[in-house]
Structures are given as structure tokens and as C-alpha cells.
From Swiss-Prot:
It comes from Fuscovulum blasticum (Rhodobacter blasticus). Keywords: ATP synthesis, ATP-binding, Cell inner membrane, Cell membrane, CF(1), Hydrogen ion transport, Ion transport, Membrane, Nucleotide-binding, Translocase, Transport. This is ATP synthase subunit alpha. The record marks 372 as: Required for activity. PROSITE patterns: ATPASE_ALPHA_BETA.
Amino acid sequence: MGIQAAEISAILKEQIKNFGKDAEVAEVGRVLSVGDGIARVYGLDNVQAGEMVEFPGGIRGMALNLEVDNVGIVIFGDDRDIKEGDTVKRTKSIVDVPAGNGLLGRVVDALGNPIDGKGPIVASERRIADVKAPGIIPRKGVHEPMATGLKAVDAMIPIGRGQRELIIGDRQTGKTAVALDTILNQKVYNDAAGDDESKKLYCVYVAIGQKRSTVAQLVKKLEETGAMAYTVVVAATASDPAPMQFLAPFSGTAIGEFFRDNGRHALMIYDDLSKQAVAYRQMSLLLRRPPGREAYPGDVFYLHSRLLERSAKMNGDFGAGSLTALPIIETQAGDISAYIPTNVISITDGQIFLESELFYQGIRPAVNTGLSVSRVGSSAQTSAMKSVAGKVKLELAQYREMAAFAQFGSDLDASTQALLNRGARLTELMKQPQYSPLTNAEIVCIIFAGTNGYLDKVAVRDVGRFEAGLLKHLRTKGKALLDDMTKNDRKVAGDLEKAIRAELDAFAKDFA
């Protein structure tokens, strides 16, 4: 069967008609050298600082050093698959990550890719990872409490929604435990809020440079307690390249800002920023940027300040949302005057200082109440907590002062002895096991008992037993009181004080 000439011409005409005149233009460069996660690229004349570029095989990188004759690019992945002479394409986009409700309950890497094996992420939008912090006009003073469920923190170092409170201490002093308990504590409040988004608090936990097993344990705990429903975990583990560890906090913050900008509340936990600074130092030195103090680059302060300034309380015209930050810093042998610790202390609105000495004495959470402060103060406390917490802080401060002197003298007058006895019991009362956060009303009742002499006759070793018994009593027979305190926040005075005293008297009578 022969093909007719007319058919051939028709086919040719069809082909010509469908010929695309649009040529795809891609700006490309060539790899000059690659190693240690850094690629030097010739070309890419119009690349922006912080722009994503693409290597063969889909490996991504970010342009950081724009020099006269080459571009320094950090690689988000394994550099073993990249070789000299490879072409590098511009993507014309700054690093961005998925954001939205679809990320809740998921574990993602620093680029927002899922790493939990639960399938693709359904994101409602994409957000640029490193954006400018809100200005002065959209902000409002911090005035709503962000309950951690820890007696020592909520009573003496209150944290408000929109605050940045640093958790600082040596390794193995319970820094992550404080942050994790704070996440677990939100479950009660989120469940009680129902559909009221203005009361809920969503959590974003950023793990930087940690072991994968540690992150897996944490996620397992969150899933077991049902806390994963309102939590996103961003993980750049120890086996990930330094650029991923550098980027993870920015990506996590972009995910948290989705809630802040939609009139909701979110909590950011950066665990920990010391490792991000180390990753940034590694990148900077390999890019041949000049080193400064402790070999960190000169802009390591700006690295942390631009990250933490994004946590803010917005005013009503901007949706009244908030982003609270709990950055964690690891110190070496309690040295809080090192470079990174002093930087982050000066950026944040207070710090919770955890001491290994207290930890080994069995005082856990090992909060040093003398060195820990909250620069927001009582404006971030409920009225009930405010009315009982002032006294406990003062009594513990006096106790610490007296305890130092009491070592030298044996003959102490009655008032000093009473102060020491009360202080020892209050110190014991501030202890709290992990994974057992308490509600605001429960903490108020416990501290009221401690500061109003209910423990003075109880032996120090029995304080924990007294507290456990009191909690059981309040959760069963005193449930109406707790519910009333939760619903109607007011000063502990008048009728409320009488009601609390009645419950305490009823319990103390049977306690033996």
C-alpha cells in the first residue's frame, strides 16, 4: 500500500502547524569545584543571594556567596553525585516550604519533604523560609498566658503567647523535657477549646543535629499521648548535611507563621540553636568567610536575631495571632558567658536556666530560680496564679539566701528556722516528674498549700506524697472547684480563697 503525496503534504503541514515557537531558556552555570558540601560554580551571573539552584539528578542547593568570578553554593544533599563540569540551573525561586493544616501530625525535613512514610503532604500554600520579621506597628504587648504545666515555670518564670523564652543548660539537664512537657500540656487546653481556634495552641518542634533515634522516640511519645494531632516536627538530624541543619529553624518558623498570620497561636521549639550555629560556622568557613570570636562568622548574631524576631504577638488589626518561641541552647560546663549563649540571652525575653548540680540532687525540672527570669513577668499570668505566685518567689529567694548563711551557724532564731523549713518544703514542692504537666488551677491550689502553711507540719520526704494525694483529692472531690477556677479566672481572695482552704482542710485532716 503506497502513501499518497497528498497525505504526506497533509502530515507535514500538521507537523509544521504544531511546531512550538517558544524555546525554553534556562540560565545555567558550570561546576568548577565541589567538596565538603560546597560547590563553586562559574556562570549564573544573575543569580540572587539565597536562591535555590538545581544540580543534575535533582539535587538542590542554595547560592550564598556571590563573588566576582564564581558563585559559592551550599548543597542540600550528598555532594558525591556532583562532579566538576556539571551544569547548574537557576530555579528563580527563593527557598520555600509547604505550610498549612496538612502538616499537622507529620514529620518533615528542612525542605518540607515528608520523612515519616505517611505519603505526600497536602499543603494549602508555600511560604518563603527566611522572611522579614513583623514591624513595630502590627505587634502588641504579650498578655495571654502560655501554660507549660510545670509548677516552677508557670509560677515563677511565666511565659506569654508571643514571648521568646530561652531554655539554657548543660547537656542532660532536662532541656528537651521542659519543651516536650509544654507540648503535652497543650492537649487539655486544645481539647477544651473545641472549635475555638483563638484558644488553641499549635506546636512546631524543630530538631537540629540530634540523633535519629532521639527524634523517633520523641515522635513516638507525642503520638502515644495524642499530642501529634496539633504538632509538626521538622527534623534535620546529625546525619543530614550542615545546610539542612542551618535551614531547619527557618523552615519550621515559616510553618509556624502560617498559624500566626491566620489569627491563630503557635509555639516554636528550636532544639537546639547551638547546633544550628555550629552548622552555620561550618558552612561559612568552607565558603571562606572570615571567622570571628570562637571561629563563628561575624553575622551569627544576625542569624539568630532574624529568626527569633519572627516570634511575635500581633494586634487585632493583624488577626491577633501569636508565635511563641522556646529556643534551646546547650552550654559547656555551665558557662553562660560564651559567645552563642550571651547572644541568644540578649535576643530573648528571658531565660530558664537549668543546672546539672540541681539535676543530680534530684530537683527536677532543675530550674535555677535565681538566674532564671521572664522579662514579660506577671502580665503573662492568670489572675489566680498572679495572686499566689509572688509569695512563693519571695520565700524561695529568702530561703536560698538564708541557706547559704545557715551552714555557718547552728543557733538560729525561730523566724529563721521557720523560713528554712518552709523553703525546704517549697523546693520539694517544685519537683515534678516528666510527662505529668498540671493544669493552671491545680498549680494554683498546690502553691497556695505551700505558701499558707499546709506543708509546715509535713516531713520534707512526705511532701511529694502530700502533693500526689492532694491532686487525687482535687480531681475527684474537688473537681467542681478546679472547673470553676478554669472557667472564671479571678484573684485568690474572698469566696475562692475560702473554697480552696475548705478543700485543703478536708484533705489535710485525713492525710497521715
